[in-house]
Amino acid sequence: MTTRLYLSPTPPRNDREGASKSTSASIKHDAYLPPADGNRVLVDRFGRIARDLRVSLTDRCNLRCTYCMPAEGLEWLPTEQTLNDAEVLRLIRIAVVKLGIRQIRFTGGEPLLRKNLEDIIAGTAALRTDEGEKVHIALTTNGLGLDKRIAGLKEAGLDRVNISLDTIDAERYVSLTRRDRLSGVLASIDAAVAAGLHPVKINAVVMPGVNEVDIVPLAEYCISKGSQLRFIEQMPLGPREQWKRGDMVTAEEILARLEEKFTLSPAKEPRGAAPAALWNVVDKSNPDITGQIGIIASVTHPFCGDCDRSRLTTDGTIRNCLFSRTETPLRDALRDGASDDELAQLWAGAMWEKKPGHGIDDEGFLQPDRPMSAIGG
């Protein structure tokens, strides 16, 4: 029997609770009038509060994954247009101290290509949230070179790591990434597990006719390593005209393949604002082999109604959604002498304009102008 895994997509809180336009107006009023201590939260018109900040540290990458970047011809941002270390840390401090951010995820491009990454993580780890806790710090990486730096990154304050791996077949890895580097990624997964950054999460984008055959082998591999595999529906973020809604491999199709090998049951822990729906898996041929797998169904079962993310690009702009067509620049204001409160106000305004959903299925949907490598995962 095939397990039915999802209910209908969750609407934004505003719609879910039947909030009126007047309620939204009061939310906006509160968002722009800080309390006595001068702090705000990043709230939008639908009552969603951003607690998770994705910080892209570079648009550069040492792979050329087919669904993310062209093989050649992509120009990198000039250094002077990107935030320097002090600017990155200042904006992170504003986000944490003044705007209620509690989790920071460093992304790219490939964040391990950022010089002084350990210093940026250490500076972030020194901050305390509005609850008096250490900021939770995570890293999303392709894994190349991570094994050689994992000890220093953990010492600096890194709590957790996500490693991208779409196949464990060597030939298919070369075809997907246009680089022969699989052994380096596998070494980094081993190093992250050994360093105790649990759970080490493995991100795999599933593409039609490309790596569907890797679904079960990836699951077996990740379970053997004690890491948590998360399958991701391919989204319209790569080279234009490559993605077609009708051709994508859906969450249901991924789970159907998993059920050929495993018994699946919903994880009991609450999902909250997490993007992945978690499933406990048991090997049908050996019940002693167990693990947990996540499915991120951003297209077929969007979780926009519970999204708690804000995004800072490497050139200092705020994106309130991965698929937003508009951005709010902070870099120039920062370099022109804006105060922390003024930058926080700009940031709050950007998040207020967040739409109820990503709109992938809307008529007239346009994918972002930036490639994924320049937005940050």
UniProtKB/Swiss-Prot annotation:
Domain of life: Bacteria
Gene3D superfamilies per record: Aldolase class I
Region (Disordered): 1-29
Free-text cofactor note: Binds 2 [4Fe-4S] clusters. Binds 1 [4Fe-4S] cluster coordinated with 3 cysteines and an exchangeable S-adenosyl-L-methionine and 1 [4Fe-4S] cluster coordinated with 3 cysteines and the GTP-derived substrate.
InterPro entries reported in the protein's UniProt record: Aldolase_TIM, Elp3/MiaA/NifB-like_rSAM, MoaA, MoaA_NifB_PqqE_Fe-S-bd_CS, MoaA_twitch, MoCo_biosynth_MoaA/MoaC, rSAM
Binding site for [4Fe-4S] cluster 1: 61, 65, 68
Pathway where it operates: Cofactor biosynthesis; molybdopterin biosynthesis
Cofactor(s) the protein needs: [4Fe-4S] cluster
EC number: 4.1.99.22
GO biological process: Mo-molybdopterin cofactor biosynthetic process
Record's catalysed reaction(s): GTP + AH2 + S-adenosyl-L-methionine = (8S)-3',8-cyclo-7,8-dihydroguanosine 5'-triphosphate + 5'-deoxyadenosine + L-methionine + A + H(+)
Signal peptide start and end residues: none
Residues that bind GTP: 54, 105, 140, 201, 309-311
Swiss-Prot/TrEMBL keywords: 4Fe-4S, GTP-binding, Iron, Iron-sulfur, Lyase, Metal-binding, Molybdenum cofactor biosynthesis, Nucleotide-binding, S-adenosyl-L-methionine
Subunit structure comment from the entry: Monomer and homodimer.
PANTHER family: MOLYBDENUM COFACTOR BIOSYNTHESIS PROTEIN 1 (PTHR22960:SF0), MOLYBDOPTERIN COFACTOR SYNTHESIS PROTEIN A (PTHR22960)
Functional note: Catalyzes the cyclization of GTP to (8S)-3',8-cyclo-7,8-dihydroguanosine 5'-triphosphate.
NCBIfam families named among the record's database cross-references: moaA
Family, similarity comment: Belongs to the radical SAM superfamily. MoaA family.
Entry protein name: GTP 3',8-cyclase
